[in-house]
C-alpha cells in the first residue's frame, strides 16, 4: 500500500528565504474531505497553563488543554526582541507568500451563487453601457484595461455589489478580496504598528483587538460566518496590518529586495481593503473611526499629505458627530468602551492639530469647544468590562505618556495660532508677553514630566562616533517614548522661534532694538543642533524609523535651519564672518542622518523627496529677489547719512501698502507705509541718490520707486505663502541660499522692537 493510499503524511520541501536548509511542509489527507491539508506544526508560543504544566501547547486560543479542562487560556505578549522578530519574519515570509498565492488562486474559482449580470448592471447602468458600446471610438481592449486598472488601484469597488448578490448563508470570508496573513505574521505586524507608529498615539485597547483578531481566525478556521462585531472591526484590522507591513520591511536587509517588495505590496493591498470596506458617508461606530485614523497614519508615513489631511478630517468630524468631544458621551456600557472613546478622540484631535500646523490650515474645532476628559493613566491590562484597577503610582502607563504628548500638541497649536495667524499684529508689548508666556508653557510642560520621561541633557558634541545602527535599546520601555516626546518638544520650540529666524544676520550692536528678535533666532539655532544630536543618539540605538513622518520632518526642518545659517555665513552676511565649527558639523551630521533614513524604505525615500522638492521650488525666486533688494538697500545706505531712525514704525501693513501702490500713489508722497518706512530709511531724505553704471548721480525717479515697491509686493506675496501654506517646511526650504538681511528689514515693520524686553 502506498503512503497516499494509507493516508500517511506526505512531505514536500520548500526553500527558505535564509539559510541553506530546507523547510519541510507536512501534508496529511483529511478523512472527511479526502483533501491534503497542512499538518499543524510546532506552536510558536505556549500558553501560561501549558508552560506551567510542561505539556505541549497547540497554540490556539483556547488551546486544546485549556479547552478540555476549562482552564483560562492566556498568552504572554509577543517577544519584542528586534533580531528575533526579523528572523521570524524572514523565515515565515515564504510560507506567507505561498499561502497568499494559494488563496488568491482559490478565489479565482467560480462561485455559482453570484449574480454577475446584476453586478454588471449595478456598476454600468444599461443605458449608459449601451451608449458606450455604440460609440464609434469604443475600444474593447482599452475599456477592459481601464476597468482592470481601476480595480487594482481601488477606484472601482465591486465588493459591496457582490456581497449583496450572495445568499445570506454564504460565509463572509468568501467575500473578502484580500485574505488575512497567517496569525503569527498578523501579530508581528500589529506589534510593529504599536512599537513604531503608535508609540505616542494610544487610541485602542490592545486586549480587545487581539481578542477580536483571534476570533476572526477561529471563524476562518472553522468556516463560520463573521459576527457583526467582527465585520465592523475588519477595516481596523486591515489598516493596522497595512501600517505594520509598511514598517516591517525596514527591518530587512537591503539585499532582501523581493521580501521588501512583498511587504510593500501587502501593506498597500491591506490599505485598499480597509478603505473599500468602509462607507465613508456613514461612519457611525468607534471601530470605523479607529480604522480611518490608522489609514491616516499609513498615508502620512507614505508621504501622501493631501490624502492624509482629508482622512483625518473625516475621522475628526465622525468623532464630533458621535459626540466624542463631550464628556456626556461617556455612558458605557463598559469601562473599556468609555476609555476607548476618550483615547480615540484625543488621538484624532491632536493629529488634526499637528497636520494643521504642518500644512497651514485652520483648526477643525477650537480647544474651548471640548470638555472631554483625558484618558486615565492605566495600562490596558488594568481595564476590564467590570471595572478599572488603578495604576501603581511609581509607574506611568503608555496612555499616561500619550496624555503628556497631547498636552504638548495643544501648546504647539496655541503657538501656531499666535505666530502664524492671518491677522497677526505688530510685535508690541502684549505680543511679546504672549510669546514669552508660550515659551514658559513649554518649559513648564517639560518640568512637570515624571523623571522617568525626561531625557539626559542634550548638548551637541563636536566629535561624534561613526553613524552606525546598533540593536534596539531594550534597557527600559520608556527609552523610545521619552525621546520621541522630547523630539516633539524641540519641534514646538522651533515653531515658536522660526518667525524670528530672519534676524540671525543682524548684529545687535548695530540695532539694539532687535535684541529680542535676535535672541529668538539664536535659540532656533541651538534647538536645531539639539534635534540633530538627539536624532543621532536615537538612530545609533535603532529607535528611529525612516517611515515615521513626525521624526523625519523635524530632522529635515532642523537641517534646513542650519543650512540657511551656513549659507548666510558663507555669503558674508553673519556678523562673525565664519561658520561655527559645531554648526557646520551638525549640518553635515544631519545630512548623513537624512541620507541614512532616506534609504530605509520607499516611503522614507518619498518623504525625503517631498521635503527636498519644497526647498527647490522657492530657492531660486527668493535668492534673486533678496539679492536685488539687498543691493538696493546697500546703495541707499551709502548715499544716505548712514544712521537708522531711532524709533521704527510699528503700524506698517504690507497689504495696505500694496493696495495703496495699486491705486497709483505718486513717488513724492511719503505715507507711513511707504518704501522708506518699511526699509527703516530716513523719512526726511527726499532726494536719495543712486549711482548708475556711468557713476552719474541722479535723484530717485518714479520708475525706481515703482520697481522697489514691486519687489516689496512680491516679498509680501512670498511671505504670505511661506507662513501659511506650509509654515513648518516651505519657510526654511525657501531660505536655503537666500540673502535675508533685506528680509530682516521687512520683518521689522511687522515686529516692532522694544529695548526693555530682554
Swiss-Prot record:
One of its GO terms (cellular component) is nucleus. SUPFAM superfamilies: Zn2/Cys6 DNA-binding domain (SSF57701). It holds the Pfam family Fungal_trans. GO terms for biological process: DNA-templated transcription; positive regulation of transcription by RNA polymerase II. Residues 47-73 bind DNA. InterPro entries: Stress_Response_Reg (IPR051711), Transcription_factor_dom_fun (IPR007219), Zn2-C6_fun-type_DNA-bd_sf (IPR036864), Zn2Cys6_DnaBD (IPR001138). Its main location: nucleus. GO terms for molecular function: DNA binding; DNA-binding transcription factor activity, RNA polymerase II-specific; zinc ion binding. Gene3D superfamilies: Zn(2)-C6 fungal-type DNA-binding domain. Induction: Weakly cell cycle regulated, peaking in S phase. The keyword Ion transport does not apply. It is found in: Nucleus. Keywords: DNA-binding, Metal-binding, Nucleus, Transcription, Transcription regulation, Zinc. The keyword Transferase does not apply. PANTHER family: ACTIVATOR OF STRESS GENES 1-RELATED, THIAMINE REPRESSIBLE GENES REGULATORY PROTEIN THI5. Belongs to the ASG1 family. This is Putative transcriptional regulatory protein YJL206C.
Amino acid at each position: 500500500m502506498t503512503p497516499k493510499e494509507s493516508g500517511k503524511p506526505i512531505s514536500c520541501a520548500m526553500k527558505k528565504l535564509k539559510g541553506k536548509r530546507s523547510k519541510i511542509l507536512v501534508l496529511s489527507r483529511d478523512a472527511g474531505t479526502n483533501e491534503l491539508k497542512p499538518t499543524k506544526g510546532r506552536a510558536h508560543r505556549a500558553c501560561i497553563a501549558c508552560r506551567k504544566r510542561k505539556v505541549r501547547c497547540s497554540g490556539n486560543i483556547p488551546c486544546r488543554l485549556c479547552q478540555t479542562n476549562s482552564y483560562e487560556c492566556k498568552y504572554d505578549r509577543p517577544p519584542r526582541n528586534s533580531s528575533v522578530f526579523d528572523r521570524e519574519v524572514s523565515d515565515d515570509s515564504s510560507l506567507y507568500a505561498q499561502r497568499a498565492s494559494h488563496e488568491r488562486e482559490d478565489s479565482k474559482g467560480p462561485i455559482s451563487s453570484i449574480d454577475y449580470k446584476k453586478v454588471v448592471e449595478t456598476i454600468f447602468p444599461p443605458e449608459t453601457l449601451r451608449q458606450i458600446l455604440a460609440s464609434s471610438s469604443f475600444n474593447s481592449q482599452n475599456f477592459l484595461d481601464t476597468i482592470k486598472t481601476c480595480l487594482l488601484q481601488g477606484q472601482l469597488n465591486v465588493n459591496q455589489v457582490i456581497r449583496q448578490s450572495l445568499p445570506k448563508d454564504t460565509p463572509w470570508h468568501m467575500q473578502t478580496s484580500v485574505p488575512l496573513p497567517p496569525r503569527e505574521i498578523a501579530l508581528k505586524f500589529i506589534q510593529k504598528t504599536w512599537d513604531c507608529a503608535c508609540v505616542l498615539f494610544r487610541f485602542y485597547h490592545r486586549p480587545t483587538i487581539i481578542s477580536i483578531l483571534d476570533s476572526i481566525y477561529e471563524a476562518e478556521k472553522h468556516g463560520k460566518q463573521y459576527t457583526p462585531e467582527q465585520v465592523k472591526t475588519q477595516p481596523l484590522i486591515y489598516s493596522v496590518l497595512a501600517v505594520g507591513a509598511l514598517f516591517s520591511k525596514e527591518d530587512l536587509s537591503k539585499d532582501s529586495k523581493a521580501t521588501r517588495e512583498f511587504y510593500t505590496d501587502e501593506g498597500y493591498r491591506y490599505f485598499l481593503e480597509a478603505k473599500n470596506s468602509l462607507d465613508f458617508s456613514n461612519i457611525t461606530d468607534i471601530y470605523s473611526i479607529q480604522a480611518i485614523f490608522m489609514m491616516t497614519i499609513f498615508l502620512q508615513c507614505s508621504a501622501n499629505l493631501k490624502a492624509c489631511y482629508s482622512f483625518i478630517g473625516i475621522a475628526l468630524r465622525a468623532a464630533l458627530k458621535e459626540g466624542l468631544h463631550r464628556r456626556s458621551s461617556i455612558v458605557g456600557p463598559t469601562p473599556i468602551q468609555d476609555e476607548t472613546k476618550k483615547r480615540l478622540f484625543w488621538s484624532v484631535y491632536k493629529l488634526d492639530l499637528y497636520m494643521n500646523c504642518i500644512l497651514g490650515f485652520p483648526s477643525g474645532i477650537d480647544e474651548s469647544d471640548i470638555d472631554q476628559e483625558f484618558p486615565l493613566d492605566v495600562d490596558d491590562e488594568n481595564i476590564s468590562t467590570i471595572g478599572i484597577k488603578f495604576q501603581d503610582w511609581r509607574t506611568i502607563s503608555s496612555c499616561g505618556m500619550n496624555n503628556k504628548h497631547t498636552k504638548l500638541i495643544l501648546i504647539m497649536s496655541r503657538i501656531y495660532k499666535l505666530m502664524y495667524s492671518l491677522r497677526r499684529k505688530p510685535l508690541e508689548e502684549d505680543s511679546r508677553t504672549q510669546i514669552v508666556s508660550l515659551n514658559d508653557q513649554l518649559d513648564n510642560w517639560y518640568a512637570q514630566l515624571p523623571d522617568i520621561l525626561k531625557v539626559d541633557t542634550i548638548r551637541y558634541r563636536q566629535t561624534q562616533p561613526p553613524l552606525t545602527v546598533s540593536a534596539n535599546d531594550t534597557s527600559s520601555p520608556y527609552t523610545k517614548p521619552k525621546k520621541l516626546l522630547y523630539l516633539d518638544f524641540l519641534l514646538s520650540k522651533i515653531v515658536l522661534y522660526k518667525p524670528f529666524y530672519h534676524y540671525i544676520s543682524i548684529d545687535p550692536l548695530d540695532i539694539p532694538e532687535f535684541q529680542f528678535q535676535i535672541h529668538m533666532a539664536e535659540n532656533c539655532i541651538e534647538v536645531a543642533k539639539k534635534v540633530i544630536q538627539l536624532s543621532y543618539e536615537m538612530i545609533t540605538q535603532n529607535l528611529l524609523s525612516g517611515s515615521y513622518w513626525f521624526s523625519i520632518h523635524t530632522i529635515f526642518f532642523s537641517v534646513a535651519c542650519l543650512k540657511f545659517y551656513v549659507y548666510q555665513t558663507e555669503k558674508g552676511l553673519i556678523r562673525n564672518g565664519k561658520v561655527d565649527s559645531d554648526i557646520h558639523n551638525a549640518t553635515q551630521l544631519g545630512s548623513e542622518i537624512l541620507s541614512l533614513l532616506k534609504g530605509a524604505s520607499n516611503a522614507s525615500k518619498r518623504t525625503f523627496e517631498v521635503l527636498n522638492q519644497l526647498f527647490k521650488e522657492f530657492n531660486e525666486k527668493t535668492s534673486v529677489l533678496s539679492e536685488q533688494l539687498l543691493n538696493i538697500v546697500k546703495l541707499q545706505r551709502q548715499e544716505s547719512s548712514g544712521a537708522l531712525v531711532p524709533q521704527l514704525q510699528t503700524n506698517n501693513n504690507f497689504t495696505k501698502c500694496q493696495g495703496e501702490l495699486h491705486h497709483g500713489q505718486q513717488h513724492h508722497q511719503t505715507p507711513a507705509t511707504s518704501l522708506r518706512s518699511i526699509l527703516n530709511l530716513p523719512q526726511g531724505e527726499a532726494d536719495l541718490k543712486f549711482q548708475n553704471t556711468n557713476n552719474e548721480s541722479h535723484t530717485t525717479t518714479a520708475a525706481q520707486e515703482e520697481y522697489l515697491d514691486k519687489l516689496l509686493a512680491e516679498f509680501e506675496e512670498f511671505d504670505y505663502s511661506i507662513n501659511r501654506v506650509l509654515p513648518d517646511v516651505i519657510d526654511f526650504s525657501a531660505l536655503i541660499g537666500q540673502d535675508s538681511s533685506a528680509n530682516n528689514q521687512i520683518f521689522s515693520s511687522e515686529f516692532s522692537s522694544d529695548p526693555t524686553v530682554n
